[in-house]
Amino acid sequence: MMIDDFETHAARSSGDLWSEVCSSLPEPREQHGGQFTDSFEPSSPGDPHTDSPRAANFSPWEPMADSEVYIAGLENRLKRIKGQTSEVTSREMLRSLSQAKKECWDRFLHDAQTSELFQEGNFDQSALEQFKRWLSPERVAINAEELEYLLLPTQNSETPASSSQTDKPCVEEEEECPSPEK
């Protein structure tokens, strides 16, 4: 059983108890009248038990060489945890480029002065409108020619006799084939 008779044991100091429990530890240093003497400064390499408040070759505090990198890493980790990452993903980059392209085309298509800058002497207004329509068809209004084409009935519904001609494929390149672009 582990119960000892407490009356037979004499009172021992904490240092004795610790040295008994941890026999591999070095002997405790002698205390100076119970006063606290550690200055939290590194001791000199020649004398590891220096009790002087200032060591002879004391150097002022300097940050470690990699402390800036370490702090930057911690800040990046904190931003990532908060969802404020500063790293640009490919999706964000593509979205940004797409938005810039859209804004640039909007300025080109809707700003008359900018459009005139790209015009040469022989570049007429209809060619510019055609170019704009080719670049961004959903943003340019249809012209009278296109409206007329959309409102006219198709060739197939005009005459039943012509439908037999359109059913056979065009064999030669010189022969005109009906197409929606014409």
From Swiss-Prot:
It is a peripheral membrane protein. The keyword Calcium does not apply. Residues 1-61, 153-182 are annotated as: Disordered. The gene is ccdc32. This is Coiled-coil domain-containing protein 32. One of its GO terms (biological process) is regulation of clathrin-dependent endocytosis. Regulates clathrin-mediated endocytsois of cargos such as transferrin probably through the association and modulation of adaptor protein complex 2 (AP-2). Has a role in ciliogenesis and is required for proper cephalic and left/right axis development. Disruption phenotype: Depletion of ccdc32 using CRISPR-Cas9-mediated gene editing results in disrupted cardiac looping in embryos at 2 dpf, reduced number and length of cilia in Kupffer's vesicle, and in a significant reduction of head size at 3 dpf. Furthermore, ccdc32 crispants exhibit significant alterations in facial skeletal morphology and have hypoplastic cerebella. Pfam families: CCDC32. Residues 1-10 have a biased composition (Basic and acidic residues). Residues 153-167 have a biased composition (Polar residues). The lineage of its organism: Eukaryota, Metazoa, Chordata, Craniata, Vertebrata. PANTHER family: COILED-COIL DOMAIN-CONTAINING PROTEIN 32. It is found in: Membrane, Coated pit.
